[in-house]
């Protein structure tokens, strides 16, 4: 199978566009609506998906995404339900890259190889383990390679050159570039400049860098693309739309549609 990320970035480059990638937690606010939400993100123009599996202690997430985890868990969602939703999304959208963003404990609890295999079977393209830096990732990387899943690494803005070099050599799929250090979300807005990090990643021939953390407005997407990123990920801002419209499904889906269209439009050069 041709790598879906490679195909996506090549197609976007031809069209002079960047990627817009929304993040949501699978199962938020419940299993049935979660599928509709993810379906809406794709049909509204998302280029790829970054999805979380609910976890009781999401360390690196800001309050918005922590609350999404709690909502999903309280609705009774299980990892099996999450894989069911992923399988349905993959069946409906054969070409879109699907990435998971999660924590090591969740992977360990299921057994690394078993978990990666389940991800592959459900149509997942990449896994980013938020609390495992590149230099500690060997056991995950080896299995990712074995089952042909891209292992994604985070490049922090304060990373040393040797760390950036390592991320470039070990990562595949794309590189998750942090726009700042700390927890995710628009609680503290993204601060550029990341140009220096982008220059280094290009120099080391890293997988395409996508900027995340604190991306909530079209102009931030524009800035990211202008700075040389291949795209932008928006998590907290997407999840906030779910949170603000819990009791009004139609309004929620309408607002998500508008948000994705507006953010995607900002990737056009």
UniProtKB/Swiss-Prot annotation:
Keyword Lyase: yes
Enzyme type, top EC level: lyase
Key words, A-Z: Amino-acid biosynthesis, Aromatic amino acid biosynthesis, Lyase, Tryptophan biosynthesis
Pathway: Amino-acid biosynthesis; L-tryptophan biosynthesis; L-tryptophan from chorismate: step 5/5
Keyword RNA-binding: no
Coiled coil: none
Recorded catalytic activity of this chain's protein: (1S,2R)-1-C-(indol-3-yl)glycerol 3-phosphate + L-serine = D-glyceraldehyde 3-phosphate + L-tryptophan + H2O
EC number annotated for this UniProt entry: 4.2.1.20
CDD domains the record matches: Tryptophan_synthase_alpha
GO cellular component: cytosol
Active site residues of this protein: 50 (proton acceptor), 61 (proton acceptor)
Gene Ontology MF annotations: tryptophan synthase activity
Family label: Belongs to the TrpA family.
Function comment: The alpha subunit is responsible for the aldol cleavage of indoleglycerol phosphate to indole and glyceraldehyde 3-phosphate.
Complex and partners: Tetramer of two alpha and two beta chains.
Cross-referenced PANTHER family: TRYPTOPHAN SYNTHASE ALPHA CHAIN, CHLOROPLASTIC, TRYPTOPHAN SYNTHASE, ALPHA CHAIN
Protein name as annotated: Tryptophan synthase alpha chain
Gene designation: trpA
């Amino acid at each position: 199978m041709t790598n879906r990320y490679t195909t996506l970035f090549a197609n976007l480059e031809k069209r002079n566009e960047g990627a817009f990638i929304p993040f949501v937690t699978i199962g938020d606010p419940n299993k049935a609506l979660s599928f509709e939400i993810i379906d809406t993100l794709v049909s509204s123009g998302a280029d790829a998906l970054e999805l979380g599996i609910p976890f009781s202690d999401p360390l690196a997430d800001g309050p918005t995404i922590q609350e999404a985890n709690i909502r999903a868990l309280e609705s009774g969602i299980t990892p099996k339900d999450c894989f069911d939703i992923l399988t349905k999304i993959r069946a409906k959208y054969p070409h879109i890259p699907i990435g998971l963003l999660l924590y090591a404990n969740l992977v360990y609890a299921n057994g690394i190889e078993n978990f990666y295999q389940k991800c592959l079977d459900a149509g997942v393209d990449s896994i980013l383990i938020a609390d495992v830096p590149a230099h500690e990732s060997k056991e995950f990387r080896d299995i990712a390679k074995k089952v042909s899943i891209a292992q994604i690494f985070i490049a922090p803005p304060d990373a040393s050159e040797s760390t950036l070099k390592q991320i470039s050599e070990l990562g595949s799929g794309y590189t998750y570039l942090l726009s700042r250090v700390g927890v995710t979300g628009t609680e503290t807005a993204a601060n550029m400049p990341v140009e220096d990090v982008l220059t280094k990643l290009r120099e080391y021939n890293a997988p395409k860098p996508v900027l995340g953390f604190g991306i909530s407005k079209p102009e931030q997407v524009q800035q990211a693309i202008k700075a040389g990123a291949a795209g932008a990920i928006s998590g907290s801002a997407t999840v906030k739309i779910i949170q603000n419209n819990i009791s009004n499904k139609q309004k929620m889906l309408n607002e998500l549609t508008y948000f994705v269209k507006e953010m995607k439009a900002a990737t056009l050069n």
